[in-house]
């Protein structure tokens, strides 16, 4: 929004032309979202506490979690507000990638909001029924996939890129829609499953989001893309603003979500952030790299799938409890140790993902 104002003023005052620089707007996007989170966070936490919008804790969960009962939740709404405001202020709102990504993020956040509202405010322990949650995730995920496919102008926009191999690609055709659907919906649910400990989900989300910003910037720059043998995708650079806002909002939220948490993000945050990472990974054609960098999310999801499958087929459990972070808690690991070690794993995996830019 402010880009338009700056463009107009630049006709009369040349200093405003600096706002045409993507890097400056990205920095401002990070700082804007960070400040919104830090300034609004305490007010939101007080309001959530006043209206008793607190986390319900499972009776069959780790005993160490019983003390978390009543901790304010639905704090993910703060993240979404910070991202939306910062993006609307600093991004080019004529860019289709920005609009699609922001739209998907807010729509998945709406699903999470309804689920949280039913659980916390209406005191319905089931929240939004799983079939309806998955239905709306499918509607929005499939809708985004079709929209990206129909608006694709270049062959590389629907081509699967294989990491570490510059000459191995796969033209997906309509298969792009199916892959996009699974990446968006899968990413959404994976982050949601990971969000079980204080700060466990938000920091990997910030790290993966920051890495995807690097891919978005380089893919949108013709010379860098050619040099690194990655697809040149005009317009993806503008996603750096959105991802910068995500990073800033996430860091601001972590200020209050770090152990011991003052607030939880809830489904409104987790579902939205996972979908955001997924849709960006698709746009910059780095789905497989996203799978690597988001390895913690993948591990958490696979642990649940294996646990359920094993119990149904054999009557036995593979893990003491799923998702995986609960397994380590029940093995005696203190919560901060689980969190930090999962962060360390994410740092390593993100570096591996970034290494694919050069190792081809």
UniProtKB/Swiss-Prot annotation:
Location (main, coarse): membrane
EC number of the protein: 2.7.8.13
Disulphide bridges, residue numbers: none
Name of the protein in its database record: Phospho-N-acetylmuramoyl-pentapeptide-transferase
Entry function: Catalyzes the initial step of the lipid cycle reactions in the biosynthesis of the cell wall peptidoglycan: transfers peptidoglycan precursor phospho-MurNAc-pentapeptide from UDP-MurNAc-pentapeptide onto the lipid carrier undecaprenyl phosphate, yielding undecaprenyl-pyrophosphoryl-MurNAc-pentapeptide, known as lipid I.
UniProt organism field: Hahella chejuensis (strain KCTC 2396)
Record keyword Membrane present: yes
GO cellular component labels: plasma membrane
Pathway(s) where this gene product acts: Cell wall biogenesis; peptidoglycan biosynthesis
Catalytic activity: UDP-N-acetyl-alpha-D-muramoyl-L-alanyl-gamma-D-glutamyl-meso-2,6-diaminopimeloyl-D-alanyl-D-alanine + di-trans,octa-cis-undecaprenyl phosphate = di-trans,octa-cis-undecaprenyl diphospho-N-acetyl-alpha-D-muramoyl-L-alanyl-D-glutamyl-meso-2,6-diaminopimeloyl-D-alanyl-D-alanine + UMP
Broad enzyme group: transferase
GN (gene name): mraY
InterPro entries with a match to the protein in the record: Glycosyl_transferase_4, PNAcMuramoyl-5peptid_Trfase, PNAcMuramoyl-5peptid_Trfase_CS
Family: Belongs to the glycosyltransferase 4 family. MraY subfamily.
């Amino acid at each position: 929004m402010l880009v338009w104002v700056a463009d107009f003023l630049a006709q009369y005052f040349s200093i405003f032309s600096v706002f045409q620089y993507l890097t400056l707007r990205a920095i401002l996007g990070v700082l804007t979202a960070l400040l919104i989170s830090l300034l609004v966070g305490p007010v939101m936490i007080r309001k959530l506490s006043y209206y008793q919008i607190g986390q319900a804790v499972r009776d069959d969960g780790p005993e160490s979690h019983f003390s978390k009962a009543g901790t304010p939740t639905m704090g993910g709404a703060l993240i979404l507000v910070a991202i939306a405001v910062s993006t609307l202020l600093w991004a080019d709102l004529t860019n289709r990638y920005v609009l699609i990504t922001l739209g998907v993020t807010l729509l998945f956040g709406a699903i999470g909001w309804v689920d949280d509202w039913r659980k916390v405010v209406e005191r319905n322990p089931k929240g939004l029924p799983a079939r309806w949650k998955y239905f709306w995730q499918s509607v929005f995920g499939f809708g985004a996939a079709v929209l990206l496919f129909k608006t694709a102008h270049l062959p590389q926009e629907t081509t699967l890129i294989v990491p570490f191999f510059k000459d191995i690609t796969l033209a997906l055709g309509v298969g792009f829609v199916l892959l996009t659907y699974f990446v968006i919906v899968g990413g959404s649910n994976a982050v949601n499953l990971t969000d079980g400990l204080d700060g466990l989900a938000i920091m990997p989300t910030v790290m993966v989001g920051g890495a995807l910003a690097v891919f978005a910037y380089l893919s949108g720059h013709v010379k860098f893309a050619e040099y690194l043998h990655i697809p040149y995708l005009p317009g993806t650079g503008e996603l750096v603003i959105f991802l910068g806002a995500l990073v800033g909002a996430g860091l601001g939220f972590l200020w209050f979500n770090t152990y011991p948490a003052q607030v939880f993000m809830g489904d409104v945050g987790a579902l939205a952030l996972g979908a955001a990472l997924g849709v960006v990974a698709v746009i910059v054609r780095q789905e497989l790299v996203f799978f690597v960098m988001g390895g913690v999310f993948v591990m958490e999801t696979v642990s649940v799938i294996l646990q359920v499958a094993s119990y149904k087929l054999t009557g036995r459990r593979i893990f003491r409890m799923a998702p995986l972070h609960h397994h380590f808690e029940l093995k005696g690991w203190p919560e901060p140790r689980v969190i930090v070690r999962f962060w360390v794993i994410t740092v390593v995996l993100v570096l591996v993902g970034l290494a694919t830019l050069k190792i081809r």
